[in-house]
């Protein structure tokens, strides 16, 4: 790694705390706070932390004025303190200010806009700021919460995941992406995202369903590009376990999108279809992609951090993450996630048991990642 972001692990830790909190808030009737904790607190903060690491390295340069990243983290901490103490309007304002500073801080560090992944991440950053602005306007009573949520998930999360996985998966399986097709995906993604967000701005559910079909088509094209990579794969060895986690997560992307389209066009299926849509997209696709990303990124950040401090840090990368145990984590998590979906489909109050099931998944993940966090302080 050319640059090591020392603030990234703290963004990741706060993101995981928000994921934990979301599992309990989902049992309440506070829909807005649930979206704040899961979408903005878990997904959004993971994206911010990851981009503080990925973007400077994509430019082969150190982050300028790194203390600004700590200011951003402080503002984010304040925002979630405000959210969880009932001050949603001030919390969303601090979140927007932190996101805005984050955007300009990283933008000033981008000199080469040509790489495909960089452009995906820049689009993700733009939508991240817009989602925070829309959330603030929601709490002021001007915009629906659905617009802010989908600006982050469809706009920021998917752009970031598409861009990063189109770089990481070919690298990890030693294949080459067809750049021309990747460029087509980028263009189509920006068109489909804009169409879907305009539909949510209008809150016309027929338009949302139609625009959702366009977004679904783009997702299928992304899946096709990944299929092509594995079809051309010359090496007979199985992919790394982190890639297996990414692939497992991808199973839930088209399913979750179809449930979202179905929910928009069949109001009578609510709220069951909407809850399953959230389970598939956020607790399934989003969470397992993030789990894989953290398991790949965090140990490398910590190891390089300690190597920069002293040539022999006294531990190896294998001490931070055990590749063999990742296979076990994936196998148990897959079974538990299937149980989570099944139990969450039950009538109230039995569906509450699903929270316990997902807590076990989180415990298994923390068992794999906790050493990387602990070695920060050694």
Curated annotation (Swiss-Prot):
Subcellular location: Cell membrane
Lineage: superkingdom: Bacteria
TM region positions: 7-29, 33-55, 68-85, 90-108, 115-137, 152-174, 204-225, 245-267, 280-302, 347-366
Topology class, membrane: Multi-pass membrane protein
Presence of the UniProt keyword Membrane in the record: yes
Annotated keywords: Cell membrane, Membrane, Transmembrane, Transmembrane helix
Cellular component annotations (GO), alphabetically ordered: plasma membrane
Record protein name field: Uncharacterized protein aq_267
Organism: Aquifex aeolicus (strain VF5)
């Amino acid at each position: 790694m050319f640059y090591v972001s020392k603030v990234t692990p703290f963004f990741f830790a706060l993101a995981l705390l928000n994921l934990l909190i979301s599992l309990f808030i989902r049992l309440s009737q506070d829909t807005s706070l649930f979206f704040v904790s899961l979408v903005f607190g878990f997904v959004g903060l993971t994206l911010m932390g990851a981009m503080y690491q990925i973007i400077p390295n994509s430019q082969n340069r150190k982050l300028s004025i790194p203390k600004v990243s700590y200011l951003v983290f402080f503002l984010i901490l304040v925002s979630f303190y405000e959210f969880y103490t009932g001050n949603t309007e001030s919390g969303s304002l601090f979140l927007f200010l932190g996101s805005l500073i984050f955007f300009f801080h990283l933008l000033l560090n981008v000199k080469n806009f040509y790489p495909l992944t960089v452009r995906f991440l820049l689009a993700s950053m733009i939508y991240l700021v817009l989602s925070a602005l829309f959330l603030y306007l929601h709490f002021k009573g001007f915009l629906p919460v659905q617009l802010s949520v989908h600006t982050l998930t469809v706009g920021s999360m998917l752009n970031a995941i598409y861009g990063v996985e189109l770089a990481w998966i070919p690298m990890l399986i030693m294949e080459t992406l067809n750049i021309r097709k990747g460029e087509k995906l980028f263009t189509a993604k920006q068109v489909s995202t804009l169409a879907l967000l305009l539909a949510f701005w209008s809150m016309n559910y027929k338009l949302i369903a139609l625009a959702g079909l366009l977004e679904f088509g783009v997702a299928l094209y992304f899946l096709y590009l990944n299929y092509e990579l594995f079809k051309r794969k010359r090496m007979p060895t199985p992919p790394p376990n982190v890639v297996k986690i990414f692939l497992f997560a991808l199973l839930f992307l088209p399913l979750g999108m179809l449930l979202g389209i179905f929910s928009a066009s069949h109001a009578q299926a609510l709220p069951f279809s909407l809850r399953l849509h959230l389970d598939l997209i956020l607790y399934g696709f989003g969470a397992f992609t993030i789990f894989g990303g953290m398991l790949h990124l965090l140990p490398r950040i910590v190891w390089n951090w300690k190597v920069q401090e002293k040539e022999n840090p006294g531990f190896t990368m294998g001490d931070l993450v055990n590749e063999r145990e990742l296979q076990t984590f994936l196998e148990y998590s897959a079974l538990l996630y299937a149980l989570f979906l099944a139990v969450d489909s039950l009538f109230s109050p039995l569906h509450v048991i699903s929270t316990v099931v997902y807590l076990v998944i989180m415990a298994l993940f923390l068992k794999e990642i906790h050493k990387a966090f602990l070695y920060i302080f050694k």
